[in-house]
C-alpha cells in the first residue's frame, strides 16, 4: 500500500504555505473521486459459498476500502442482476420468507450485500467490484497510486487551488487541473472497461519544478 502522505511533497511547491494535513486530506478526496468516476480500482473477490437461509454477506475487501459498485456477480455459474431496494420490495414483497436459487443482488452498504431469493443451499458466488478508499483511510493500493499518480495529483491540485482567500488560491489553475483530472479519469474508465481509449493526451504533469501557470488555452475540444 502507498500512503497519501508520500505524495504530499509533490503537491507542496504549487500550494505555498498549505499545511501537510490539508494536502493529504485533498489527496484522499481526489483519489476517492477518481475511483468513483473511473471504476478503475477493481478487485475480483475470492469465491465463497452461500449458506442456506442466509441472504446478507460481507464484501471481502482490503482494510481501508469500500465497494463503490458491484461490476459482476454470479451464483452457481449464472449471472445475477442488480436490483434497487424499491424494485426488490415491489417485485418480491415476500422474498424474506422464500428460499430458492438467487438471481438478483442488492448492494446494501459499502461493505455488505444481499442476494435474493434467500439461498436454499450452498453454492459458489463470484464477484468483481470497483473499490474506493474510505474517508478515514491513510493508504491506497500501490498499483493504483503508481498507475494513476498524475490523476491523483491533478485532482488534489484542482481542489486545493480553488480554496478561497489563501496564499495559494488560483482559480484559473484550478480549472485547468480539473480539466486534466477529467481527462485522466475518462482514460482510466475506458481502460478499466477494456475499451478504446480514444482520448488525446494533452499536457502531462511533470513533477516538482514546473511553474504554477504552465498551461495556455487548450484550444480544440477533446474528442471522447
Model regions and ranges:
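Glycine-enriched, solvent-exposed interface loops adjoining structured elements
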Residues: 1-224
Amino acid at each position: 500500500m502507498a500512503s497519501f502522505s508520500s505524495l504530499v511533497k509533490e503537491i507542496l511547491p504549487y500550494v505555498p504555505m498549505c499545511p501537510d494535513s490539508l494536502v493529504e486530506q485533498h489527496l484522499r478526496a481526489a483519489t476517492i473521486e477518481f475511483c468513483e468516476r473511473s471504476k478503475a480500482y477493481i478487485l475480483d473477490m475470492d469465491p465463497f459459498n452461500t449458506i442456506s437461509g442466509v441472504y446478507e454477506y460481507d464484501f471481502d475487501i482490503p482494510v481501508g476500502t469500500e465497494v463503490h459498485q458491484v461490476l459482476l456477480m454470479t451464483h452457481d455459474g449464472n449471472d445475477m442482476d442488480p436490483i434497487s431496494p424499491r424494485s426488490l420490495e415491489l417485485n418480491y414483497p415476500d422474498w424474506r420468507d422464500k428460499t430458492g436459487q438467487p438471481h438478483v443482488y442488492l448492494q446494501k452498504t459499502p461493505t455488505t450485500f444481499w442476494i435474493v431469493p434467500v439461498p436454499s443451499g450452498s453454492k459458489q458466488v463470484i464477484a468483481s467490484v470497483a473499490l474506493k478508499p474510505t474517508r478515514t483511510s491513510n493508504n491506497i493500493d500501490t498499483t493504483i497510486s503508481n498507475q494513476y499518480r498524475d490523476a491523483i495529483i491533478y485532482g488534489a491540485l484542482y481542489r486545493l487551488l480553488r480554496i478561497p482567500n489563501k496564499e495559494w488560491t488560483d482559480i484559473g489553475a484550478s480549472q485547468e487541473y480539473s480539466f486534466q483530472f477529467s481527462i485522466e479519469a475518462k482514460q482510466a474508465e475506458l481502460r478499466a472497461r477494456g475499451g478504446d481509449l480514444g482520448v488525446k493526451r494533452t499536457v502531462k504533469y511533470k513533477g516538482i519544478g514546473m511553474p504554477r501557470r504552465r498551461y495556455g488555452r487548450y484550444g480544440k475540444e477533446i474528442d471522447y
